[in-house]
A protein has these predicted regions:
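Amphipathic alpha-helical substructures
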Residues: 301, 412-495
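Beta-strand-rich binding/interaction modules
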Residues: 75-77, 211-214, 465, 481, ...
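Acidic/His/Gly-enriched intrinsically disordered linker/tail segments
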Residues: 353-430
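N-terminal, polar/Ser/Thr-rich
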Residues: 18-45, 74, 466-467, 472
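Juxtacatalytic substrate-recognition/specificity segment
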Residues: 255-355, 359, 363, 558
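Extended, low-hydrophobicity, Ser/Thr/Pro/Gly-biased non-transmembrane segments
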Residues: 103, 119-249
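Zn2+-dependent metallopeptidase catalytic core
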Residues: 48, 193, 200-211, 236-244, ...
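A surface-exposed beta-strand-loop module
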Residues: 71-148, 185-190, 229-232, 534-545, ...
Length: 574
């Protein structure tokens, strides 16, 4: 055979294998890792076992394992035998470095659908602060550094999981911050790993014995020992064994530093030296909002953990009831709003982001109302509305079917902001007491169907809400766009007026929306259900001559329309 032709054949086979590679075929069912961290050297070394299951419909002989591009593969074995692999850089914004180190592996035999294999792996390298993916996307360097602050170092090591730093093996398709692919890739990964678990023995090496490991898992044990000593220094080591699960929507995250713990019944604050007063402010804020939070969501099932980050400008990060944040205590109200969010996470956990995250944000709006009234709560929610409108507009421009409904959405804007509004609308529709009953009857272990929570709400409210769930949960119909179509006042024999108000929803999503009729003596309010692309008429009696009708007070997320307010001419001028 002609050598050139032979080479072309080989290349074709290799390219065919590359194109056929399914990076999403395997689910990482369980990790059992020992992770050693050297803060002084910014170093990480890990070894352990990974259990993978073929969740595709076809047998799989090839797979990929990916770690941060600042780490390298040392070994990959199956049944005690080394597997040949090729490790190459893989450009993607899944990791803070803007790339992964991907090992392409060919297995000795195909793994059938639902088949399980267990690999022994070893890898290591360094984790330094790196915001390449953000600066590459045009984010200013200073802003990028405050967002992607993850690093192993002194005085604080803080490392988040997939989506920030791939410090444990993953397998995802390439994704970019320049479009929606990063959010979609992470959402698919989180959904596929929603039942996966991890056990990680996280160890540090250093010259002080005061280092602590804090992680967003369940602590199973702590072990410390002296590794060696010289006239100049003593080398210490400590290990903390954590179990994480499920890890799909809660990426394993850890911090290592000389932390001091300020412990209260509902919260533990881990602070650095000299920060006890600020730590107490966090504890006091949590204790102040706890009774109100418990009335709504029930008593916390776990403790809130606040872990101090050293740099004042770093962006806070939450993972369930754990919050990594620089201490910010000058605004007491903001602190209380932040703490009720963490307490809500501690009270209600759910495998569904629209419940877990949506309720936490809803709790913040409730606290804003508790502090300064309904208008303040609506203003709080409206600061996030432009992002939601932009996300819905972007989804509408995409050809093909609309994105999944809120019950299964992996878009952060949807399961945080839109879900917050959904909970607020449900509260306005069914009342506090009914919604509280539904929330307190929720059991995550029984949530095996997307209709589970909606059924609890409908049962507690005693009314048919299927139309609302269909528009806002099961399907993504976008946002309403309300306008006052007409308003006709009619004088009554008692000297009052009845105003026939017709509201039109130009959007596809319906809602129960408040309408307001303004008179010289004040304002009358009534609620009306307006279905998408339809009109609804409501008659409102007011004590004096009406001057204006307004639809929506901002409690329903809607596209703004200049026709949302309509002036009513005085009766004498009609």
């Amino acid at each position: 055979m002609n050598p050139v032709f032979r080479l072309l054949c080989v290349l074709c086979v290799l390219c065919g294998s590359c194109f056929a590679l399914d990076r999403a075929a395997f689910t990482f069912v369980h990790y059992d890792l020992e992770v050693r961290v050297d803060p002084a050297g910014h170093a990480l070394a890990a070894r352990g076992a990974i259990r993978l299951r073929n969740d595709s419909a076809a047998p799989q002989k090839d797979l990929t394992l990916q770690i941060s591009s600042s780490l390298g593969w040392r070994m990959i074995e199956l049944n005690g035998k080394p597997l040949p692999f090729v490790a190459e850089p893989y450009t993607t914004d899944v990791d803070h470095t803007g790339a992964l180190t991907e090992a392409a592996i060919t297995l000795p035999a195909p793994v059938p659908p639902r088949g399980v294999i267990e690999l022994e792996v070893g890898y290591g390298g360094t984790v330094t602060q790196d915001a390449t993916r953000l600066t590459r996307a045009g984010v200013p360097a200073a802003t990028a550094a405050r967002t992607d602050w993850d690093q192993i170092g002194e005085p604080v090591t803080a490392v988040r999981g997939v989506g920030y730093v791939a410090w444990y093996p993953v397998s995802l398709p390439a994704a970019s911050l320049a479009d929606t692919s990063l959010g979609e890739a992470l959402a698919d990964w989180k959904n596929s790993q929603r039942q996966s678990t991890m056990r990680a023995n996280i160890c540090w090496v250093g010259e002080t014995q005061q280092l602590s490991v804090i992680a967003n898992g369940r602590l199973e044990g702590v072990n410390r020992r002296v590794l060696g000593a010289t006239d100049e220094a003593t080398t210490q080591a400590g290990c903390s064994l954590y179990s994480f699960g499920p890890i799909g929507w809660t990426a394993p995250t850890f911090a290592i530093a000389e932390y001091t713990a300020l412990s209260r019944p509902a919260i533990t604050v881990y602070h650095l030296a000299g920060e006890q007063a600020a730590a107490q402010e966090y504890a006091l804020a949590a204790e102040k909002v706890l009774p109100f939070e418990s009335d709504w969501f029930g008593a916390p099932r776990s403790k809130v953990e606040v872990v101090q980050l050293p740099a004042a400008g770093d962006a806070p990060f939450e993972s369930g009831p754990m919050l990594l944040t620089p201490f910010q205590t000058t605004d007491r109200k903001a602190l209380e709003v932040g703490m009720i969010r963490q307490l809500a996470h501690a009270s209600i956990s759910s495998p569904r982001p629209w419940i877990e995250e949506g309720l936490a944000h809803f709790a913040q709006a409730l606290e804003r109302e508790q502090l300064d009234g309904r208008r303040a709560a609506i203003t709080y929610m409206q600061q996030y509305l432009p992002a939601l409108i932009a996300a819905e507009a972007s989804a509408a421009r995409v050809s093909g079917p609309r994105p999944p409904g809120l019950v299964s959405s992996g878009d952060e804007i949807m399961y945080r902001v839109k879900a917050m509004y959904v909970w607020w609308m449900l509260r306005d529709m069914v009342g506090d007491a009914a919604l509280e009953r539904a929330l307190k009857s929720y059991r995550p272990a029984q949530d095996n169907d997307t209709g589970y929570m909606p059924q609890l709400i409908a049962q507690a409210a005693g009314r048919d809400l299927e139309w609302f769930f269909d528009d806002w949960l099961y399907r993504d119909r976008g946002l309403p766009e309300f306008r006052v179509d007409s308003a006709y006042p009619r004088a009554t024999l008692r000297g009052a007026y009845v105003v026939a108000v017709t509201i039109e929803d130009l959007g596809a999503a319906g809602a129960e929306v408040p309408i307001f009729v303004t008179t010289s003596g004040g304002e009358m309010r009534k609620r009306v259900i307006v279905k998408g692309k339809q009109k609804a008429t409501e008659r409102i009696e007011v004590p004096g001559a009406p001057s204006e009708v307004t639809v929506n007070d901002g409690s329903v997320p809607a596209i703004s329309n200049p026709g949302a307010t309509l002036k009513i001419a005085p009766p004498a001028q009609r």
